[in-house]
């Protein structure tokens, strides 16, 4: 049976999602930040006859994330999703790719990435960080956006600044940076921060300063901070060279993540 989830279901929903906390980072983060009853966010669940959860679907604005611990049944949600064209869907690849064969759905453009997590700081080098790494405030947003706009492979949209500002204001994301002569030359952010984990996004270094290990130093600082807080860091990558850097610092692949946009 499928029905909308409410805050009365929270304990059961959270216990279900927590077993794969890293993969469910976005759903957990959105529930903690916005709850079950806003105009831009809804959750549905399919229950077995004995009352246990079989699967969950999150709507955040016009994007959807499905999740199940077992074999996902796409037909449970097809009628609900068929109204959205093209459908913006993302999630664990083994789940969302099942929707490709649903005749009533029109999916957006597909993008597949590696999903990895870092559980602790055991793999970090013993040498102390030799650069000053700062935590951004609202006053630094303009300089961070300037860095991003100077990087050809870093897509920035009108929404990017708004998202960065909202993350800092709501404590759902933070940005670390290194500056030289008042100019930010490298930065990395988190998004979807929740009680268990956070997603690493926006890893970037100005082209004139690459090859000095600045991004790695910022990531080391982030790993140290989140390990102290008892939280897991996660990230997506599709560039094998970047993947090697992340793995040296202790990130491990835990699956594939597919987005349709």
Describe each region flagged by the PLM.
Residues 1-26, 120-158:
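Short amphipathic alpha-helix that is part of the acyltransferase structural core
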Residues 1-2, 15, 21, 29-84, ...:
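Conserved donor-binding loop and adjoining core beta-sheet/short helix segment
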Residues 22-40, 48, 155-181:
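Active-site rim helix/loop that mediates acceptor-substrate recognition in acyltransferases
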Residues 48, 60-129:
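Acyl-donor-binding surface of acyltransferase catalytic domains
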Residues 72-79, 201, 205, 211-225, ...:
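Conserved acetyl-CoA-binding loop-helix of GNAT-fold acetyltransferases
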Residues 90-96, 233-247, 259-261:
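Conserved beta-strand-loop-alpha-helix junction that forms the acyl-donor binding cleft
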Residues 103-110, 249-257:
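Conserved acetyl-CoA-binding loop of GNAT-fold acetyltransferases
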Residues 144, 172-189, 197-198:
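Conserved active-site beta-strand-loop modules that form the wall/rim of enzyme catalytic pockets
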